[in-house]
Structures are given as C-alpha cells and as structure tokens.
Amino acid sequence: MVDKINLEGWMRPSIRTLKAYESKSIPDCVRLDANENPLPWPPGMIEQLLGSDIAFNRYPDGGAQELKEALSRYTGVPAEGILTGNGSDELIQLLMTTFGGEKGAVVIHPPTFSMYEAAARVTGTGVLEVPLLLTETGRDFRLDVEGMLKAAAQPQVHMIVLCNPNNPTGTLFPREEILRIVAESGKIVIVDEAYGEFSGESVVDQIPYCPNLLVMKTFSKLFAMAALRLGYLLGQPSIIGALNRARQPFNVNSFSQKAGAIALNYGKEYAEQGRILTAELAKIVEALTAFASVKVFATRANFVLFQPEDPDRVYQELIGKGFLIRNMGNLPLVGKALRLSAGSPEDNERLIKALGEILK
C-alpha cells in the first residue's frame, strides 16, 4: 500500500504556486460581493424554462445550435462566429489553452479580473502586465495604450485582454483606444464585455472588419443567470473554429442552453432591469461621495470601487449589519479598497443607512 505520494513534486511548477479560489459565503447576509443581478427573472420566464422539453438522460447539443441562433439574433453575429462556454471562466482558460501555453504570453492591464492571470498560470502562459494609469482626478483610470502596444510587440505575445468596463475599477475605456490596439498590435485582442449591457458600449459591430478581435460576454450579470454558468465568445468564424478544436465536446449543459435561449426573448425586460440597477448604484455612489474621507472611483458598471480610511473595518462592520461586499485587498495603483454591487431597491436603502452609521 502507498502511504504517501509526492504531489508537490509531480505538480507543474506553475500550478504549485497557485492558491485554490475561495468564494466567501456568510448566511443571512445580503450578497453584494459578486456583481450579480439581484432582481427576479422576468414574469413567465421560469415557467417557460421549466415547461421546456429537455431530455435530461441525453448529452446536450455539443454545438448549442438553438442558443447560438438566439445569440445571433441578439448580437448580429452569425452563428458560426459564436462559441458558448460553461461560464466565461471556461472560455478564458480555453483561450489560454489554444493560443497560450509555455511558448505564448498574454498582455493584461492590472488591476483587472483575476481569472485572466489565473488561467494563464494554469496553462503555463506567460503574463505581461501593463498597469492602468490614474487620471489627474485620482478617481478614474485609463489604458496605457503605448505601453500595451510595446508589450504586444514581443514575439511570445499572442493575446491581449481588455476588460471593458473593467472589473474591479468600473472604468469604461474609449472605443477608439480599444480599436487602435486591435488594429496596431497584430495580436488576438479579447475584449471582455461582461458588464457591457450596463455601459451601453460595445465593439461587437467591429468583428466583421477585425479578424483578430474576440468579444466575450456572459449571462451571469444583467441576465441574472450566474448559477447556470453560461458565457459566450463572438468573433470571425476562423478564430472561433480554432477555439473549437480545443473545446470540450459537451461543455454547456442542456438546461443552461435552453435558459439562455429563452432569456434572450426577454430583452426589453432585462434592459429595464439594467436601468433600475444603474439608478440604484447612482444612489449608493452619491451616498458614498458625501463622505470626504471616502474616495469613490468612477464606474460604468453595476458596481463601484471605493476606498474608505479603514477598508478592513468597514468590511467587517458591514458584515455585522448583514451585508457582504468584496474586500479587494491591496490593488495595484489603489491600495486597500472595497467593491460593492447594486442590490434590490429595498436592500440598497438599508445599505445606505448602514454605510452612514459606519462612516460617520
């Protein structure tokens, strides 16, 4: 019998240094830590989904044709230019697997979504960091376009990832800067528009003209389907075809495929929810801005990054008052900061009251 195995020695070095992702869950707390849509699904949608004819004893459609046709109508991108995934996390790792690896590298702009670097490390892909720049106000960020183009010129770089609006800062980068990077870098540019429905901005319309452009979107945010893990990539058929070579054959389950296809029929209702959440976040931002001791960063998403004098204390005291937000720890350019997303109108009213009591 084997008593002990050399796990650490057998691990790839890039995995050995990683820490497992941990999602915090505190019972009886209102969750404002994951940038989810807290509002209920539009009336009739759950009934339509549960009444659907889904063969649970059969493998799902590996090509997700019904969902891709619905996405094609929603985005204007042909079905052959769409790839669906088990959440954006799977798609990010698929991108690194396909175009990265030990001989490839990706350019990212910290502070940004942590999964880009995590997926790169797992796949052995090199990471080149070109930090964002603070604007003169000190409350907003911008891309270092020249720095990103310089980094992208290195031969091992195959990809650039731009998160727009950016998580966790909420920054919306100018369209012309993104398209300049697409045009001048010559590398694959992935624009993560997970929060694009809140900003109202997108570069999807440029896909027909840019063979190196990929746009990533999700059903986890505005469409309130975080539990079902459903994301998608948009691009020209050639680059989507390349990614399909490395994709798992049945990567999106039948229930999620059907839910996504049905959700896209409720576009008007979800757009209204987006307006509600944007207005609710504005109330929270206004309340935070009223405190001179709090730095509030500009946002075009459904969340806001802010910096009180003692972030750890504010975080813990909010938990004590029934609210779980995200403690971002030490962020590049920022330092210790907190992030919270808009909740329901009722929860936001209670949150603003709690913040007032803590920050006074």
Curated annotation (Swiss-Prot):
UniProt xrefs under PANTHER family: HISTIDINOL-PHOSPHATE AMINOTRANSFERASE, HISTIDINOL-PHOSPHATE AMINOTRANSFERASE-RELATED
Organism: Desulfitobacterium hafniense (strain Y51)
Protein name: Histidinol-phosphate aminotransferase
Alphabetic keyword roster: Amino-acid biosynthesis, Aminotransferase, Histidine biosynthesis, Pyridoxal phosphate, Transferase
Pathway: Amino-acid biosynthesis; L-histidine biosynthesis; L-histidine from 5-phospho-alpha-D-ribose 1-diphosphate: step 7/9
Similarity comment: Belongs to the class-II pyridoxal-phosphate-dependent aminotransferase family. Histidinol-phosphate aminotransferase subfamily.
HAMAP family, sorted: HisC_aminotrans_2
Molecular function via GO: histidinol-phosphate transaminase activity; pyridoxal phosphate binding
Reaction catalysed by this enzyme: L-histidinol phosphate + 2-oxoglutarate = 3-(imidazol-4-yl)-2-oxopropyl phosphate + L-glutamate
EC id: 2.6.1.9
Gene Ontology BP annotations: L-histidine biosynthetic process
Top enzyme class: transferase
Gene3D superfamilies attached to this UniProt entry: Aspartate Aminotransferase, domain 1, Type I PLP-dependent aspartate aminotransferase-like (Major domain)
